Every structure is written in structure tokens, then in C-alpha cells.
Curated annotation (Swiss-Prot):
Catalyzes the formation of acetyl phosphate from acetate and ATP. Can also catalyze the reverse reaction. ATP binds at K15, H206, I207, G208, N209, G210, D283, M284, R285, G331, M332, G333, E334, N335. Mg(2+) binds at N8, E383. One of its GO terms (biological process) is acetate metabolic process. Its main location: cytoplasm. Its EC number is 2.7.2.1. GO terms for cellular component: cytoplasm. The active site is at D146 (proton donor/acceptor). InterPro entries: Ac/propionate_kinase, Aliphatic_acid_kin_short-chain, Aliphatic_acid_kinase_CS, ATPase_NBD. Keywords: ATP-binding, Cytoplasm, Kinase, Magnesium, Metal-binding, Nucleotide-binding, Transferase. It is found in: Cytoplasm. Belongs to the acetokinase family. The lineage of its organism: Bacteria, Bacillati, Bacillota, Bacilli, Lactobacillales. This is Acetate kinase.
Length: 398
């Protein structure tokens, strides 16, 4: 038996989950927020209890020390050496990492170099990796990349229709994201359907604050909606998703607050999507409350959101030449029945039909009717478990 920590580190946060392996039992989980800011918050959940502390945590190394000391303080572990592996979620692996890898100095350097592909994510992940290596130098650290699952895409799918020198010289191409989530829910869908994954054509819809949709052909990613960065695809919580790129120089010319391309991209990443259109929130619960109040901006934001998701799912029916099932996962995908109802309502031509008694908050499983030609599934994603499994698989290979 061993204990493995799955880590998702951001620029100012560190989310974690501790597993007993190979039993895959969750021993504890938590998050450290506001790293580098005043009044940092450390939350630990274990044995049905929740402990919260307000601290000043200056960097990721200090955050990791607090996390490990809390595990001992609350009796979850007796000593650091009970932890036998650490797994880190890394958003961008580019073309360098086609699968999960054991961390060494070169790998860490490459992750930092790939920050250009995920400037909001990779630097935080690198800081988390460095902190754990400093504090637990003898324990195996493994990186699990969001992009790895999508390296199976064909060249004609991942290349953009621009001069090829931009790919050969600068590696401009579609990379995708959320790969760990898409891989996990596809595996779970195969179990639920009682069929080998290698025989299935699935469309997996990861709909949270970030939104990505993937065409899964026989267990491999055939296409996915996120692109060179996670900004591409359908409308999201704070991200615009796909727009005409000519809008960027136009806005720089017209709006004095947008001084350069970086300003526009920041607006598209952080101030757009549901939040930007509605002026209310990036949270679907707040948008749905706005629908109840007939708030016109909430209605508009919701309608754009549904429209973009339907279009994306529809194109993947074409990519796969049909599908056996559509899988909803992540925060909104799992917990927004109205959104699922309205998305499926625009896809009935493909032979999908959902049971309103099953399409309710909290239900997991097959929500389609017996007559539905394409099954509609709601599956809880578990990226942390995928990370822990890869640590278990790789920890003796370094």
C-alpha cells in the first residue's frame, strides 16, 4: 500500500487530493488559495471533517510545507515518508510530451519553456513541481499533461490553414486541453455501456468554467475544440471561445483601453464568455437565476452559450460519422439539467432523446430514453484519480 498526492497548482492556488493506492481510496483533500497574497486560506477535508486556516503564505514552497504539516497534524499521515508519489497536472505539454512522465531537471525546464502555450497555467504547475521536489527530493514526481491525450489527432486535424512555416518554425497548431478528463470519462462511458472502448465512437463534453468538447474514436482523440491555447472552442465562463481573429487589431485601433494584442487576449480570456455577455457572472447558477427574472442580458448569454455548444457537438457527429453516446461532465455538464435539456433539444435530429425524470440535479448515469439511438450519459470526471493512477504506474520506472 502507498499514499499518493495528486496536485493541481495554479499561480496563486494549490488543489490537492491524497489517495491510498492501489485501493484508490481518498484519504483527504483540500486547497490552498491566495498564495502570495494576504490572508491565504488553507482548507483540509478528511473523515467528514473540514479544517480551515487563514494564513500568510508567500509562495508555493511555503504552501507545500503547510500542506504536509497539516497532514501530520490532523493524523492523516504519521511522517512525510508515508507519501510515495506526487502527481502534477500540467496543462500544456506541447509536442514534447505524448504521455505522462517522471519529473527530472530537463522535464521541469521544458514545462517552463512551454508556458507560452498556457501562460495562465504552466508557471503555477512548475512552481508546484519545484516546491515538492525541494521538500520531498527522494519521492517520485510525475507530470500528467492535459494535452497528451490529444496527440493522437491527425495532422490534417491539428494544423491550422496558414503557411506551414508557422508550424515548422514556431509549432503553431491545435493542442487541445482537458485531455485527462476526456480520457477518464470515455473509459467510464465504456464501462457504463458494457462495450469495449475500442469499438465506441463518443462525444465527450467537458462543460465547466472552461469548456472543451472532444470526438473520441475507439478510445483516441480524433478532434477537440480547444486549440493552440484553451481560449479556443465554444463560449465559456469567462473566455470568449472562437472569434474572428480580425477583431483583435480592430479593437486595438478602436478602444484606447486595449493597447496591444496582449490586452485583447486578456479580455477574451478573463472578461468575456458568460460573464462578459451577461454582466452578471460566469456561474451558470447565476445565469439561470437571471433567466427566471427575465434579465435580457442573462437570456442572451445563455442563448449564445447553448448555440455554440450545439454547433460544436454537431460538427463532431460529422467527424466521427455518427456517435454511440454523448457524455456530459465537469461542473456545468454534471450539474446543469436545464443546459443539458436545451443542448439536446437542438440535437434530436441525430436520434438523441433524454428522460426528463433522469435529467435532474444530482443524477449520474444514462439519462436517455430507451428509444434514443444515441445514449446521453452524465459522468463525474475524476482527473485527480487519473493522475494518481499514472503515478502508481510510473513511480518505479525512474
Amino acid at each position: 500500500m502507498s499514499k499518493t498526492i495528486a496536485i493541481n497548482a495554479g499561480s496563486s492556488s494549490l488543489k490537492w487530493q491524497l489517495y491510498q493506492m492501489p485501493e484508490e481510496a481518498v484519504l483527504a483533500q483540500g486547497i490552498i488559495e491566495r498564495i502570495g497574497l494576504k490572508d491565504s486560506i488553507s482548507t483540509v477535508k478528511y473523515d467528514g471533517k473540514k479544517e480551515e486556516q487563514i494564513l500568510d503564505i508567500h509562495d508555493h514552497t511555503e504552501a507545500v510545507k503547510i500542506l504536509l504539516n497539516d497532514l501530520i497534524h490532523f493524523g492523516i499521515i504519521a511522517a512525510y515518508d508515508e507519501i510515495t508519489g506526487v502527481g502534477h497536472r500540467v496543462v500544456a505539454g506541447g509536442e514534447l510530451f505524448k504521455e505522462s512522465v517522471v519529473v527530472n531537471d530537463k522535464v521541469l525546464e521544458q514545462i517552463e519553456e512551454l508556458s507560452v502555450l498556457a501562460p495562465l497555467h504552466n508557471p503555477g504547475a512548475a512552481a508546484g513541481i519545484r516546491a515538492f521536489r525541494d521538500i520531498l527530493p527522494d519521492i517520485t514526481s510525475v507530470c500528467v499533461f492535459d494535452t497528451s491525450f490529444h496527440t493522437s489527432m491527425a495532422k490534417h486535424t491539428y494544423l491550422y490553414p496558414i503557411p506551414q512555416k508557422y508550424y515548422t518554425d514556431y509549432k503553431v497548431r491545435k493542442y487541445g486541453a482537458h485531455g485527462t478528463s476526456h480520457k477518464y470519462v470515455a473509459q467510464e462511458a465504456a464501462k457504463m455501456l458494457g462495450r469495449p472502448l475500442e469499438e465506441l465512437k463518443l462525444i465527450t463534453a467537458h462543460i465547466g468554467n472552461g469548456v472543451s468538447i472532444t470526438a473520441n474514436y475507439h478510445g483516441q482523440s480524433a478532434d477537440t475544440s480547444m486549440g493552440f491555447t484553451p481560449l479556443a472552442g465554444p463560449m465559456m465562463g469567462t473566455r470568449s471561445g472562437d472569434i474572428d481573429p480580425a477583431i483583435i487589431p480592430y479593437l486595438i485601433e478602436q478602444d484606447p483601453e486595449l493597447k496591444d494584442a496582449a490586452d485583447v487576449v486578456n479580455m477574451l480570456n478573463k472578461k468575456s464568455g458568460l460573464s462578459g455577455v451577461s454582466g452578471i457572472s460566469s456561474d451558470m447558477r447565476d445565469i439561470e437565476a437571471g433567466l427566471q427574472e427575465d434579465n435580457p442580458d442573462a437570456v442572451l448569454a445563455y442563448n449564445i452559450f447553448i448555440d455554440r455548444i450545439k454547433k460544436c457537438i454537431g460538427q463532431y457527429f460529422a467527424v466521427l460519422n455518427g456517435a454511440d453516446a454523448l457524455v456530459f461532465t465537469a461542473g456545468m455538464g454534471e450539474n446543469a439539467p436545464l443546459m443539458r435539456q436545451d443542448v439536446i433539444g437542438g440535437l434530436t435530429w441525430f436520434g438523441m432523446d433524454i428522460d426528463p425524470e433522469k435529467n435532474v440535479f444530482g443524477y449520474r448515469g444514462d439519462i436517455s430514453t430507451p428509444e434514443s439511438k444515441v445514449k446521453v450519459l452524465v459522468i463525474s470526471t475524476d482527473e485527480e484519480l487519473c493522475i494518481a493512477r499514472d503515478v502508481e504506474r510510473l513511480k518505479n520506472t525512474k
